[in-house]
Regions:
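Short conserved loop adjoining the S-adenosyl-L-methionine
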Residues: 104-108
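C-terminal alpha-helical "lid/dimerization" subdomain adjacent to the S-adenosyl-L-methionine
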Residues: 149-200
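Conserved beta-strand signature within the Rossmann-like core of class I S-adenosyl-L-methionine
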Residues: 141-149
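A short glycine-rich, Lys/Arg-flanked "PGG" loop and its adjoining helix->strand segment in the class I
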Residues: 128-140
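Class I SAM-dependent methyltransferase SAM/SAH-binding core
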Residues: 46, 52-103
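A conserved beta-strand element that flanks and buttresses the S-adenosyl-L-methionine
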Residues: 114
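Core SAM-dependent methyltransferase catalytic element
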Residues: 204-225
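Class I SAM-dependent methyltransferase Rossmann-like catalytic core
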Residues: 2-28, 35-37
Length: 225
């Protein structure tokens, strides 16, 4: 069996995610557009689990004219993504990458923190601790904009969402490719229900607003007031 790994899809990683999650390009575009309401000069913008760095580079290109003095940091632990980082850092003087574990990152003076499908790969204990760190590191008025896969607490609804999701993925992948990925992610990804996810974020002190949903995937703006 050929197992799915993030490394094997690295060359076309963003395209792979777009084919795997219906509406991903709209989610990505929404986060990019929302960033302009929060990025501020002389603050830090952080993308947690930045993979190829596409979102960070998009935010720089969108915001640099009006907000030229913001600094952008990508956090990534998967070494297979590191290859292009030095090139990116040379091209964008506002950009740097933290090549390591998000639990070791010091969130400070942040106007915006983003994360796309990252928390779901952490242990529940680490999720809460990281969310708490993000809240403390954000400036008042800042935001944590993130998206996660959730699961329904109703088994019937969960089955509906799962099979509709598989039907969508069959437009782009074979049954074997879908199964291989599921087998691999089963041991890595442990989603929350929406209720559990919202509670973790609210317990950290955030005010939350859902701005996007497709199947069991949600996008949330969490505000530090």
């Amino acid at each position: 069996m050929t197992k799915f790994t993030f490394a094997t899809s690295k060359e076309g990683f963003d395209n792979h995610i777009d084919k795997s999650v219906r509406g991903y390009s709209h989610l990505w575009g929404d986060i990019l557009n929302l960033s302009k309401y929060f990025v501020e000069d002389y603050t830090q913008v952080v993308d947690m689990g930045c993979s190829s760095g596409k979102l960070l580079k998009g935010m720089i290109e969108q915001n640099v004219k009006n907000i030229p003095h913001a600094q952008y940091t990508g956090i990534e632990i998967e070494e297979d993504f590191f290859g292009d980082y030095t090139h990116d850092e040379n091209k964008y003087h506002q950009l740097n990458y933290f090549r390591g574990d998000v639990r070791e990152f010091d969130f400070q003076n942040c106007s915006l923190v983003t994360s796309i499908f990252t928390l779901q790969f952490m242990s529940p204990k680490d999720r809460q601790e990281v969310i708490n760190k993000i809240y403390k590191g954000l400036n008042t008025g800042g935001a944590f904009i993130f998206s996660e896969k959730t699961f329904s607490c109703n088994p019937r609804v969960q089955d509906m969402m799962t099979f509709m999701f598989y039907d969508y993925k069959r437009q782009h992948f074979t049954d074997k490719e879908i199964l291989d990925k599921e087998v691999t992610l089963r041991h890595m990804m442990k989603p929350n229900t929406k209720t559990e996810l919202y509670k973790m974020v609210q317990d950290a002190g955030f005010e939350i607003h859902t701005f996007w949903q497709n199947f069991n995937f949600v996008g949330i703006v969490a505000l530090k007031k």
